[in-house]
Amino acid sequence: MPELIRKKKKMSSFEMIAFGFAGVILLGAIILMLPISSSAGVVTPFDKTLFTATSAVCVTGLVVVDTGSYWSAFGQAVILLLIQTGGLGVITVVASFSMVSGRKISLMQRSTMQDAISAPKVGGIVRLTKFILQGTFLIELIGAILMLPVFCRDYGWKGIWMSVFHSVSAFCNAGFDLFGIKEPFSSLTFYHSNIYLNIIIMLLIITGGIGFLVWGDIGTHKHRIRRYSLQSKVVLMTSAVLIVLPALYFFFFEYDHGTIHDRTIHSLFQSVTTLSLIHISEPTRHSLIS
């Protein structure tokens, strides 16, 4: 029997990551089922909560109920935690608790962390993880502070929560929003003319979207692009192409009104994010396909 136990196959890093994500999704779905999670105080069907939790952890932004009007503040907080966990990665979140508690991180845990964030080597993985956590929370905090003037003007004290939620959601590229409290599934249509807010959200999405390893290269080598890793160069070049080309299409074929400045910002915004400044039925069929 002891020999069988010794020969028992250990769970690989990828299995731990997969089971970790599945566990977080299932836990989130169960919590969202509770009456306290919905604004109406009712039990939400499991299929809806499972879809919402999966969408939040996988940061897809797809929803079956309007986030702002259907879920209570508690439910929205659960969704935000799921988004943050999905954006950082389950293993990174778990590792952060170990660091805060002062526990030593084993070699096996370091290897799992390496796989979780696709780091090139195990060496320096703890330092890289700290950089990721500090960078994430700092940028999200700055984003929330910059949004405060807009949302506190429109929502009062609730504007603080609106700022935090949308900063985290944008940085994690989640696509979730709370603007349904004005009109269900309205997204950013009520703020289509607020260029200041559009730019902040767009910059948060781009900053979060390029990835942790690119941050590391930028932080280490600054403007010396030649020293960037091949992965960072590919990510930056591909991101630029995928942002600029669709933006040019939107600019010339969709927006035939407004100033050049407004058209430029709106085109870039629609290229960067799935959040909508216009109702989805308004663009042409060609734009919806692109």
Label each region the model flagged.
Residues 1-289:
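Membrane-proximal intracellular helices of multi-pass ion channels
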